[in-house]
Amino acid sequence: AGRLLSEDEQFDCYAAVAEAFKGRPLNIRLADMGGDKAAQFLSIPREDNPVLGYRGARLLLGQPDLVLCQARAIARTSTITPVQVIYPMIADAQQFYTLRGMFRQAIEGMDHGEIRHGVMFEVPSACVCAREMLKVADFGSIGSNDLIQYLFAVDRDNDLVAGDYTPDKAAFWRVLGMIAEASKETGKPVSLCGEMGGQTEYIPKLLEIGVNSVSVSPRIISLARLTAKSRLSAIGS
């Protein structure tokens, strides 16, 4: 749109989707701008390395009006169906505390339904502290695209190092295992999203380590369910 959508415009977009969910939880990520998702209308100064700069949680903390507007639209949406709010690019628990506090303050006095608050695991520092993060969050979501990029210090858009941008590395699965273990210990669910979620060959291993929810594109939902069912049957036998 070339501009920030108003509260009413955001609500109209969310409500159209919420109506289709019929009481099932709707995941909505807070504005994840900056880096590879630059928004010109925010007038952010040019950065030499935007992927490591003013983006995600840092941008939201510096642009509170973004949180205010979106939070109010989300609160209105939650009267239609439960909403799970995902906080992007969280580096430590303090960022999550602060942003969640800003969200709650923004909707104070509003009528709203069930709203749950979750951490996006895509910055390695958050993954290392997964247990502490999940103790205070309602759920977690693993952002595989950025996590791979930051974990291996590889630019996913650079053809020269494209070979290093892969989930097929032991260190990556060790980190996923840490998050899954923290999920079990705290009783907080963890899901996975990103390009990896669309590659069904990873579903069995994800189920094995304890990640039992994966975001996939509509065209492969049936295949993903079949793969998961097959793996769960094998585990149960």
Task: Locate predicted features.
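Conserved alpha/beta-domain cores
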Residues: A1-S237
